[in-house]
Amino acid sequence: MKPDAQRVKQFLLSLQDDICQQLAAVDGADFVEDSWQRDAGGGGRSRVLRNGGVFEQAGVNFSHVHGDAMPASATAHRPELAGRSFEAMGVSLVVHPLNPYIPTSHANVRFFIAEKPGAEPVWWFGGGFDLTPYYAFEEDAIHWHRTARDLCQPYGEDVYPRYKKWCDDYFFLKHRDEQRGIGGLFFDDLNTPDFDSCFRFMQAVGKGYTDAFLPIVERRKAMVWGERERHFQLYRRGRYVEFNLVWDRGTLFGLQTGGRTESILMSMPPLVRWEYDWQPEEGSPEAALSEFIKVRDWV
C-alpha cells in the first residue's frame, strides 16, 4: 500500500505526548513546550523538563521538515535521492538523570519519504533506543535488552540480534575505541515487507522505550550518591557529547537541512567535564564500567 505520511505524523505526535506524560509522572516536574517553524518548510515542537526531582534534563522533540531537494548528508550514501523533494519526521529524545546510578537514555523513531513526479516514492523507517549507564548493574542491562528482544520477537527471530548488532556498531566512539553504552536497538532504511508492517514495528519500538527505561529509573532513583559519583557522571557525559558532535548522522542531517539548532542540540547534557588523561581507581565501581560496556549478549 502507498505510504501514508499523515498517519505516521499523528502517531508521532501522540507518542511525544505519551512519553512526556510518563516521564513527568515519574519526576513530578512539567515539560515546557516550544513550538517552532522552519523557514524552508515544516517545523516541530520541542519539550524540555529541566532541574526536576529525578531528571536533570529530559528533552523530547517532534519534528516534521520538508523541502525541494535533499541535503548532502542524505544523498552521500543514497545517490538515487538526488533531485527529489523530501519529508522527514520523527520523535527524538534524550533523558539525562540527576542521580548517577540512573543511566542516560536515548530513543528515536523516524520516517522519511522522497518523491518526484512519475516515479515511485522512496521511503523508509528508522529508529531505536540505547542506554548509557555510569555504573554497572547487570539486572538493568538484562531488563533493557529483554524488553528490546521481546518487542522484536513478533517480527522474526533474527530481528533483535540484527538490530542489536547494528546498535553496537553505530554507537561506537572510534577515536576512543569504546562503546557509548550498552546499546539496545538501531534500525534504518526499513521498507520491507510493506508499509503497514514497517509502521507497526516502528510503533512497537517507540512504545517500548518507556517499558525498557522506567523500571530502571524506579529501581535506582532512591540510591544515595555523592560528589565522587557526580564527578564520574560528568566525566562520562563527555563521551556522549563527543559522539553526538563527531559521529552522529542525525545531528549532521539536522544541521545540514537547516533544522532548529536548539532542538538538535537538546540531546546535550546540561553539565559535563573533560579531564586530561583521567583514570579511575583500580578495582573501583568506576573502573568496572569500561568492561561492562563492552559488546556482549545480554539475553
Curated annotation (Swiss-Prot):
Substrate binds at S92, N108, V109, R110, G258, G259, R260. Its main location: cytoplasm. The record marks H175 as: Important for dimerization. Residues 240-275 are annotated as: Important for dimerization. Gene3D superfamilies: Coproporphyrinogen III oxidase, aerobic. A divalent metal cation binds at H96, H106, H145, H175. The keyword Oxidoreductase applies. The active site is at H106. Homodimer. This is Oxygen-dependent coproporphyrinogen-III oxidase. It comes from Citrobacter koseri (strain ATCC BAA-895 / CDC 4225-83 / SGSC4696). The gene is hemF.
